Amino acid sequence: MKIVIQRVKRAQVSIDQQLRSSIGQGLLLLVGVGPDDSQEDMDYAVRKIVNMRIFSDAEGKMNLSIKDIDGEILSISQFTLHADTKKGNRPAFVKAAPPEMASNFYDAFNLALQQEVPTRTGIFGADMQVELVNDGPVTIILDTKNR
């Protein structure tokens, strides 16, 4: 799994100019599923995301997790995180999981997140418009294959 984690003041996703989901303070996740991602990868990602201390405490130090601040998550599927850009100028996406596998994995990932933190989503495979107000900005890239 490759996940871009962004700390946000607020975020929302629309599809066909209709608001699908929105959150207040929390995390926007851009989630890419690879063909060899496993339950172990999912468990690792969920554990890292919900416990990562990237929110400021009273002294302004990044010392609080999303759980500590009662924040929310907006999770957006993004297969383009697995783009292969080595050859030519057009990215190839052969390193992304096949759509059916990725969709099921993404749904299970979101259910696991929901057990820990209120989680909203876009729609897998849809053309989405994502709006966010970055906080910091704080942006972290999590790759479950690099641990």
From Swiss-Prot:
**Could you tell me what this protein is called?**
D-aminoacyl-tRNA deacylase
Q: Which SUPFAM superfamilies match?
A: DTD-like (SSF69500)
What gene is this protein a product of? Answer: dtd
Print the organism lineage.
Bacteria, Bacillati, Bacillota, Bacilli, Lactobacillales
Q: According to the UniProt entry, what is the EC number of this protein?
A: 3.1.1.96
Q: Which reaction does it catalyse?
A: glycyl-tRNA(Ala) + H2O = tRNA(Ala) + glycine + H(+); a D-aminoacyl-tRNA + H2O = a tRNA + a D-alpha-amino acid + H(+)
Domain note for this entry?
A Gly-cisPro motif from one monomer fits into the active site of the other monomer to allow specific chiral rejection of L-amino acids.
Q: Which InterPro entries match?
A: Daa-tRNA_deacyls_DTD (IPR003732), DTD-like_sf (IPR023509)
Q: How does it assemble?
A: Homodimer.
Q: Where are the transmembrane segments?
A: none
